[in-house]
Amino acid sequence: MRILSIALFCCAFVTVNAQKTKQEVAEAINSKYTTYSTIAKKIWDYAEVGYKETKSSALLQETLAQAGFKIEKGVAGIPTAFIATYGSGKPVIGILGEYDALPGISQDAVPEVKTIGGKTSGHACGHHLFGTASAAAAIEVKHWMIATKKSGTLRFYGTPAEEGGAGKVYMVREGLFKDVDVVLHWHPASLNNAETGGTLANKNGKFRFYGIASHASASPERGRSALDAVEAMNVMVNMMREHVTPETRIHYVITRGGEAPNVVPAFAEVYYYVRHPNREEVKAVWERMVKAAQGAAMGTETRMEVEVMGGVYNMLPNETLAKVMDKNLHTV
């Protein structure tokens, strides 16, 4: 976390030759290691899922406010989204911070399988480090700007619901990034490196099927199973896997499948993700899946509706900045 904070700082304003400045910043961040690690540990313990990161967001807001940042709460109509700003004028440098956890996982911070009792969510992707290290970098950039009398605007974007909620999409729609010159972003991993690869575009949504309930033993002929429709759709989508490009990723989970085996389910729901490096390919695969769902509904005499839950374009990397980041990672 310390290394990434320092590297983010170096990429924000400092020239690659300012070795003395980098060393001073490294020492400053290291001296505050206990403070920042405590913040990260608290967010780890909170383990709040997307759009519900109330305590995690508040903690980062408080940390940045105490460091002299102006806080704008609840941006884009999202209670846990915020922007922390320091300075004015150009350039406008954005630093992203995430802090949402994943549902259905509560692994303890140990190298073997060990769940945390009483918890149903956890930080499998290290977002407790993501938000904290980004905040640390922003704070140190601010201190450097004061010391060197540098002008410019520094913004920390508190971005909720990265895990499937596409929180940043709503922030982009509100124009919160319109005047930004560059955005710095990182993610915890098992090693420190700077990549020039992009990310997968994504579209996800829920397919809901409505049938007719009936007793499965006494009057099965009167029922129309919504679960049959879900299973029929899944079979067709699984057959489709042979006929999509190798980079395509399709994931699903049945979220509703009925209440009892002896009752024909009147309602069933399946949640799908589609990913691909190209947004247009995601769209094309999604349209084929919708046709499969329509066919499943027709064949089972049920009714189908689909709700798109979210979607994102593939990230466009900046090779020049990646090289700068890589050089600074080796430096620190």
Predicted regions mapped to residue ranges:
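Histidine/acidic-residue-rich, glycine-tolerant segments that coordinate divalent metal ions
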Residues: 113-122, 128-129, 145-267
